[in-house]
Amino acid sequence: MSVFKGEVTALPPDKSISHRAALIGALSDGTTEIVNFSGGFDNQSTLAVLQASGIALIQEECAGSYGRRIRRVVIESRGLWSFLAPQAPLMCNNSGSTMRMFAGILAAQPFESVLEGDSSLMKRPMNRVADPLRQMGAQVELSFSGTAPIRIQGTKDLHSLEYRLPVSSAQVKSLVAFAALHADGQTRIIEPIRSRDHTELMLGLETIDQPNGERVIIVPGRKRIESKPFYIPADPSAACFIVALALLAKGSDIIIRDLCLNPTRTGYLAILAGAGAGISVENSRVIGGEAIGDVLVHSEGELNSLVISDPHEVANVIDEIPMLAVLSAFSSGRFELHHAAELRTKESDRIDALVVNLERLGFQCEQYPDGFKVNGRIAMPKGVVSIESFDDHRIAMSFAIAGKATGVDLAISDIGVVGVSFPNFFEIIESLEV
């Protein structure tokens, strides 16, 4: 089996922060410079819908740290109502973040627009998008099954509200916040279970933590947003795959540079450290309100099996669960997950996708509506094992890491889907292999 050593300086820029930086730049008054913008398919979809809606922007390469070439995006805008009616439906491709968050902005624009996506995105539920926007005064139409296309008749007369999030969703929280920026008063968003907080940090919104554990986000309406520069750190959700590679391949040592260490994004590091993983952080600092640092990962032996059952914990590792599940199964033979029904409405039904593929690899699994359990390995299949990616980048990468680290020969369908979030995935892995 292979061993992996070295430092990673070219992880994809954070996907979540890149989306928000572009959208906030389009809402700002002036020139917004975004340094180290993500080149992933999803983030490029956000830039494309902005341009199709009349926002002027340029994207170019420039010199970055560690001798890298990085992307720089410059957005010119005139504030909250700078958008123009698109001439055709806005294509979000596979990006649920683009579709959901941009819907909040379009709800406040005085024209009709339509948001569409690829075949996968058009199957994902969008009632959670439509409901708060309708309450604020926008007209929103979905398909009969509650999915895209999303047809929005926006209005400049949105009104503020107090909105309690029905599920833990940073995307829904953000779309309500973006709409509320245009509303006629102060909006209060109540978050029972805390999700990633990039939108609040980047907009400088007031937050109030309640004694019962809830968080209230205060969004002032019709306030000018001054343009400011953004720097995008490395994506912790992408880093999860490199961390797993180091932990599965015995004798490996990897350093990941300039990683976003926002506490709402690094729950998986705490979970793995608690299971016996050799993980440490150095060179910590804060840039633009976000914690950043270098993460050192050392393979120190077998990990304890992972049990993820606390709703707050699930919310903070929702994107990393596929890799955590595969890592735990291959390391200890066991894994258990509860309170994660949200996974069934991602790019694929990730619970089912994980179970199907783990069973092909000889693991005994049991799934239920909000999670699943791995109960050990019955037998190791011989020869090449076919893995179904379900056209889901995180499923594809999770099993690719397992195959590379353990030497199991896997044939993964539609492997090019990794480009959605991690275009240089295989290039980085190959650079680390000793």
UniProtKB/Swiss-Prot annotation:
A GO MF annotation of the entry reads: 3-phosphoshikimate 1-carboxyvinyltransferase activity
- Indicate the principal place this protein occupies in or around the cell: cytoplasm
Query: Which residues does 3-phosphoshikimate bind?
Result: 15-16, 20, 169, 171, 195, 319, 346
Q: Which gene encodes it?
A: aroA
Q: Which HAMAP family match?
A: EPSP_synth (MF_00210)
Localization: Cytoplasm
Q: Per UniProt, where does phosphoenolpyruvate bind?
A: 15, 96, 124, 171, 350, 394
Pfam families found in the cross-reference section = EPSP_synthase (PF00275)
Per the record, the pathway is: Metabolic intermediate biosynthesis; chorismate biosynthesis; chorismate from D-erythrose 4-phosphate and phosphoenolpyruvate: step 6/7
Which biological processes are named by the entry's GO terms? amino acid biosynthetic process; aromatic amino acid family biosynthetic process; chorismate biosynthetic process
Function of the protein: Catalyzes the transfer of the enolpyruvyl moiety of phosphoenolpyruvate (PEP) to the 5-hydroxyl of shikimate-3-phosphate (S3P) to produce enolpyruvyl shikimate-3-phosphate and inorganic phosphate.
Provide GO CC annotations from the record.
Answer: cytoplasm
NCBIfam families to which the protein is assigned, alphabetical: aroA
InterPro entries for the chain: Enolpyruvate_Tfrase_dom (IPR001986), Enolpyruvate_Tfrase_sf (IPR036968), EPSP_synthase (IPR006264), EPSP_synthase_CS (IPR023193), RNA3'P_cycl/enolpyr_Trfase_a/b (IPR013792)
Name of the protein described by the UniProt record? 3-phosphoshikimate 1-carboxyvinyltransferase
